[in-house]
From Swiss-Prot:
Organism: Rickettsia bellii (strain RML369-C)
Record flagged with keyword Repeat: yes
One Pfam family named in its UniProt record: Ank_2
The keyword Repeat belongs to this UniProt entry's keyword annotation: yes
PANTHER family assigned to the protein according to its UniProt record, in alphabetical order: ANKYRIN REPEAT AND PROTEIN KINASE DOMAIN-CONTAINING PROTEIN, ANKYRIN REPEAT-CONTAINING PROTEIN-RELATED
Protein's recorded name: Putative ankyrin repeat protein RBE_0623
ANK repeat segments: 70-99, 104-134, 137-166
Superkingdom field: Bacteria
Keywords: ANK repeat, Repeat
């Protein structure tokens, strides 16, 4: 069975590092973009009842073409290689789509968002991702998309994220109002989802305003004022009698 190491970081599951010859073969095949060899290794692991969907690399591969660290999940290795076919194969075989890496907490979704790999983002979002908006010590995938101006990816994420989970980290995500593209993208989602999202933004502005504004430059604060005014006007014109409108940036 795979070697198991307990990791006390609350974000990470128990990590299964590759140990057997078959597991090593699978990891090496994914690292070196050998899809056929990876399929054979997975088939043999399934036959031997020794397959785990949380298999990790047990060594680092750092050279001109690889940036793989010990403890990377195999879907993360695939997206680091920008190998969409390998990613599709791993996900179809049951690998978890968004497990954070042991070394640096990178998730496949965060990585492809950061890199701007739109097709890989779209493929990952076809699978249930419970931690879609967690930060794991970094900016959220959505904030990363906005920072790096990956507009199409930001649209995909906003469309996928349940509004109730959108502000999983309220202080982190409400700062999105400082980005000039945020409202442009928000305008393309449905009215009901927009209202839910704006209500959450409004609540978090009220609760965290001092922290939100701390360290922001004049242009960012100006964007926040403009976007927040638009948001409150939209809510004022579209809310029902049960909606409480709160949240202004002073």
């Amino acid at each position: 069975m795979p070697k198991t190491i307990n990791n006390y970081n609350r974000f990470l599951p128990v990590v299964h590092f590759s140990q057997t010859e078959l597991e090593e073969s699978l990891c090496n095949a994914v690292i070196h973009n050998d899809k056929k060899a990876a399929e054979i290794a997975i088939f043999k692991l399934n036959i031997s009842d020794n397959f785990t969907s949380d298999l990790r690399t047990n060594k680092s591969y750092i050279d001109d073409t690889h940036n793989i660290f010990i403890g990377d999940s195999l879907p993360l290795v695939a997206v680091k290689n920008n190998n969409l076919d390998m990613l599709k194969m791993l996900l179809s075989c049951g690998f978890e789509p968004n497990t954070p890496a042991a070394a640096n907490c990178y998730t496949p979704l965060w990585y492809v968002t950061y890199k701007g790999y739109t097709n890989s983002v779209r493929k990952l979002l076809e699978y249930p991702i419970n931690n879609i908006n967690e930060t794991f010590g970094k900016e959220t995938p959505l904030k990363s998309a906005l920072i790096h101006k990956h507009t199409e990816i930001a649209k995909l994420l906003i469309d996928k994220i349940n509004p109730d989970k959108f502000l999983f980290n309220g202080v982190e995500n409400i700062a999105l109002l400082a980005h000039d593209q945020f409202m442009f993208i928000i305008n393309e989602i449905s009215t009901d989802k927009k209202i839910s999202l704006f209500k959450l933004c409004s609540k978090n502005i009220t609760e965290h305003q001092d922290f939100i504004l701390f360290g922001k430059g004049e242009a960012e604060i100006n964007n926040m004022h403009i976007n927040n005014t638009y948001m409150l006007d939209y809510l004022d014109n579209n809310h029902d009698d049960s909606t409480t409108i709160i949240g202004s940036i002073d």
